[in-house]
């Protein structure tokens, strides 16, 4: 394997400005998210979510990930299709 000398990277003024803009955007988003959490936390939702029964906890998780469970049918025709016994 051939070795080569490290390539020098030049830091330009445009790069610094872009970095500062992105950092400011991230900070404002973080502050907005914290403000929403503080307002949501004062409603008491956090305390209810922690102390509630497992069914509602499971339901909260399913809602968060977008999972909508379908009830399983219990009759034989749905399990075996159109087979006749």
From Swiss-Prot:
Keyword match Transmembrane: no
Subcellular location: Nucleus
Primary subcellular site in the record, as a coarse category: nucleus
Regions of compositional bias (Polar residues) in chain numbering: 73-85
Stored InterPro entries: APC_suCDC26
GO terms (BP aspect): anaphase-promoting complex-dependent catabolic process; cell division; protein branched polyubiquitination; protein K11-linked ubiquitination; protein K48-linked ubiquitination; regulation of meiotic cell cycle; regulation of mitotic cell cycle
Pathway, per record: Protein modification; protein ubiquitination
Region (Disordered) residue spans: 30-85
Modified residues (Phosphoserine): 42, 82
Keywords associated with the record: Cell cycle, Cell division, Coiled coil, Mitosis, Nucleus, Phosphoprotein, Ubl conjugation pathway
Coiled coil: 7-38
Source domain of life: Eukaryota
GO cellular component: anaphase-promoting complex; cytosol; nucleoplasm
Subunit structure: V-shaped homodimer. Interacts with CDC16. The mammalian APC/C is composed at least of 14 distinct subunits ANAPC1, ANAPC2, CDC27/APC3, ANAPC4, ANAPC5, CDC16/APC6, ANAPC7, CDC23/APC8, ANAPC10, ANAPC11, CDC26/APC12, ANAPC13, ANAPC15 and ANAPC16 that assemble into a complex of at least 19 chains with a combined molecular mass of around 1.2 MDa; APC/C interacts with FZR1 and FBXO5. Interacts with FBXO43.
Similarity field: Belongs to the CDC26 family.
Primary role: Component of the anaphase promoting complex/cyclosome (APC/C), a cell cycle-regulated E3 ubiquitin ligase that controls progression through mitosis and the G1 phase of the cell cycle. The APC/C complex acts by mediating ubiquitination and subsequent degradation of target proteins: it mainly mediates the formation of 'Lys-11'-linked polyubiquitin chains and, to a lower extent, the formation of 'Lys-48'- and 'Lys-63'-linked polyubiquitin chains. The APC/C complex catalyzes assembly of branched 'Lys-11'-/'Lys-48'-linked branched ubiquitin chains on target proteins.
This protein's name: Anaphase-promoting complex subunit CDC26
Organism: Homo sapiens (Human)
